[in-house]
Amino acid sequence: MSELLSIALFLASVLIYAWKAGRNTWWFAAILAVLGLFVVLNITLYASDYFTGDGINDAVLYTLTNSLTGAGVSKYILPGAGIVLALAAVFSALGWVLRRRRHHPHHFGYSLLALLLALGSVDASPAFRQISELVKSQSRDGDPDFPAYYKEPSKTIPNPQLNLVYIYGESLERTYFDNDAFPDLTPELGALKNEGLDFSHTMQLPGTDYTIAGMVASQCGIPLFAPFEGNASASVSSFFPQNICLGDILKNSGYQNYFVQGANLRFAGKDVFLKSHGFDHLYGAEELKTVVADPSYRNDWGFYDDTVLDEAWKKFEELSRSGQRFSLFTLTVDTHHPDGFISRTCNRKRYDFDGKPNQSFSAVSCSQENIAEFINKIKASPWFKNTVIVVSSDHLAMNNTAWKYLNKQDRNNLFFVLRGDQPQQDTLAVKRNTMDNGATVLDILGGDNFIGLGRSSLSGQSLSEVFLNSKEKILAMKPDIIRLWNFPKEMKDFTVDRDKDMIAFSGSHFRLPLLLRVSDKRVEPLPESEYSAPLRFQLANFAPRDNFVWVDRCYKMAQLWAPELALSTDWCVSQGQLGGQQSIQHVDKAQWKGKTAFKDTVIDMERYKGNVDTLKIVDNDIRYKADSFIFNVAGAPEEVKQFSGISRPESWGRWSNAQLGDEVKIEYNTPLPKKFDLVITAKAFGANANRPIPVRVGKEEQTLVLENEVTTTTLHFDNPSNASTLVIVPPDPVSTNEGNILGHSPRKLGIGMVEIKVVNAEG
């Protein structure tokens, strides 16, 4: 209703000003600004819906000041460009309409009415309401009801009898199981759901709407609100350290806790969370690659669901035979947005909807088949009678190719339970949320019926039942939940552990690199993650007087304040204010002690602008002083004009990447010498080893042969044509996820370059 009202007010404002108000420069500017704000808000809402499927939420608020990099981001470039073009077109059209009758005399009353209508359209828009609520949630002191509803469970289960298998289905919400809406989409897993306790109204609350947040909510009974962006949790050393979560209780009760997934465990800090709360046995992409049958059978995120669930079954068999009490948690990935992935063992690899194939529905149909097969193996085993199986979605699906069809339905998360000890079949329509999952499981296992804000749906009352406005209530509790981190409010002394890549201050530990905004009674950590911008881009968003401490590789900050460190990959510490004084120090000891020293100086806006502009220089445009091209740092020597076909820097160097160009091209500012030696330190990837690799300068061509290990080769060139471009052509680029950023499309690797040096041989 508010959406229609806001649009009506917007159109009324445009029409009244365009046809009745006449022209006045100041009124025109004011009305265009307010109407433009309406447009920006609604396009932001549309874009947020596209990425999150949940409007403008906490993740969007974070992203407004940080670039979105990471999982599958290339698939969003075209929609993002379309949004920018649409915004420009709408602004141009709006300005043209408002100036249509510019020669008519100005009318104060109609101008005022148009402005009031424009302001009303902004106030009535859902986007403005969502942003306002989020901003309020950042500034509240907390909710007086929090102490009454937050309850710590007992640390043990009195007499545990049952093993636990808990399956998180990535984005596998209950909506997919509506056979009327999506016929025969989930026949195998749907049949199993109907055999157990099916909780049909599991809503999604703020702070539970992405994977690590859904896991925290389901095990600790609280949403993931933190003093930093949730997916950046990989940088912390402990996760809600004061909370008692399901894993803690299981471990204290004699359970061995296992977790198996196909993606990298470090992503979003899953390893930190699980290790902090009772899990001693973790298996992710790195751990599984030495044990799976086919290590090359992977998707963009890691191993396919059939591989992961096969390993989970092996672990279930092994643990059951041992007689040890255990819990086995697993997380699928094939249904990850925006498209999903199809395991090769599925019987149904395609699902048509609206008369055409739909990749997301196809991935759901395939993944549920894999999950059902895993469950049926357990049910057919002699150990099922001592086992509880839980299947839940980690969160509602984000914007995938099925999302518009899901939104036409009443959407709920999946949560059902299969008990081997006492089979029960029922559909329970009680109102609940993800935070109730862990408490319900704990209740079934014989423990308390509450964890944090979660309550057992079998014997307790969910906050979703108690409060009609449960979403607003949870946002009001956000400051209370953030305080559970026990995060320090000041930073004076700190220690950088060079060997462990950690920084410690005021009792807290963080993985490096790290950027901190330090103010009175608040320290705000800004870690670097797959979803956040590089730290220098985050620092560029700081105000001129914001105090910062930045710990990163020296070369990343050297171009600003210490050019002599431009080739150093050691750790450095920089601190100060972008508009004031800055310092940079080289971490030259294993345990390096530092102190914050912020000076209250006069702000220089020219210095501030220069620092911000330098921080925003993209990697490939950075230049440093050196007599060779060093590939394990960003940028290139000053002599290089441009380069292409080369991937990002890694600790050892850089790979060629045929996704960025079939050839490695390095163009210098001036012609290369008439005679020179080209000294190449490099290695080959896969099938490119021990094969001739053409290296060209102008019309001259030499052949390079590399091994899988790094070697140094010198090639002798004549350059009579004064060519300025060096070209290297990997013979057989291989599509692989080797060393890839989680969620990115595979790279096509050919050669790995450590250093290239041009040595003048004239005279």
Swiss-Prot record:
Keyword Heme: no
Catalysis: reaction(s): a phosphatidylglycerol + a membrane-derived-oligosaccharide D-glucose = a 1,2-diacyl-sn-glycerol + a membrane-derived-oligosaccharide 6-(glycerophospho)-D-glucose
GO aspect biological process, one term: glucan biosynthetic process
Record membrane topology: Multi-pass membrane protein
Residue ranges the record marks as coiled coil: none
Compartments it resides in: Cell inner membrane
Thylakoid among keywords: no
GO MF terms held by the record: phosphatidylglycerol-membrane-oligosaccharide glycerophosphotransferase activity
InterPro entries given in the database record: Alkaline_phosphatase_core_sf, DUF7024, OpgB, OpgB/LTA_synthase_biosynth, Sulfatase_N
Pathway: Glycan metabolism; osmoregulated periplasmic glucan (OPG) biosynthesis
Superkingdom in the source lineage: Bacteria
Assigned EC number: 2.7.8.20
SUPFAM superfamilies: Alkaline phosphatase-like
Top-rank EC class of the record's enzyme: transferase
Listed transmembrane segments: 1-21, 26-46, 77-97, 108-128
Key words, A-Z: Cell inner membrane, Cell membrane, Membrane, Transferase, Transmembrane, Transmembrane helix
Family, per entry: Belongs to the OpgB family.
Its biological purpose: Transfers a phosphoglycerol residue from phosphatidylglycerol to the membrane-bound nascent glucan backbones.
Designated name of the protein: Phosphoglycerol transferase I
Source organism: Citrobacter koseri (strain ATCC BAA-895 / CDC 4225-83 / SGSC4696)
Organism lineage string: Bacteria, Pseudomonadati, Pseudomonadota, Gammaproteobacteria, Enterobacterales
